[in-house]
Amino acid sequence: IPVTRVPKVKVGVVGEIYVKYSPLGNNDLQKFLESQDCEVNFPGLMGFVQYCAFNMGEDHVLYGGKLAVKVGTDQFLNWLDSVERAMLKAETDAGFYAPGPFKELVEKPKGVISLGAKMGEGWLLTAEMIELVQGGYGNIVCAQPFGCLPNHIVGKGMVNKIRALYPSANITPIDYDPSATRVNQENRIKLMLAVAKERLNAPVEAHPLTAEQLVGGAPQVGATV
């Protein structure tokens, strides 16, 4: 199938699993972002399944327990890894963006949040934000139900830490609640997108050549030739 690739603002969406995926829960977030001419990336559900299985084995590492549980979850994860490899290969072979394997995802939050933080989406949410930033999706909407304490810790609470590590990260947490107006939610997202669009256009406008440089003078440091 012919594909026309044009520069677009790339936006990743993370958050509490229901609000993240459900158009009813997030006021048609994907449709809204696409209406703003964005390329939208929702990390897949496979990672959450692997995360749940991984946590069972991690509990044995942190707190002890039956070795059979650890062995069983490791075997299950190995099977999931084989399924994941086939999925990622199908995506990349077709020319689509594919995330890294789960084994790499587990390493990303280390030094930022403990793998023992597994309330709700836990460390997975933080890891997904880091992976999105590293993959070029530095504009991120963190969708959460109003008053969701786990999300305030592993999502909203990690934003400053991620920004310290990746200054280009443009993350906005959005609370979804029946009492929250859709207009306010969309206006906050539009503010984030305004920053993203400025950055998208910046390389075109940056470092124009002077008349002297065009004649043959030496370009200044940082100038585009």
Model regions and ranges:
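An N-terminal assembly and electron-transfer interface module characteristic of large anaerobic redox
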Residues: 1-225
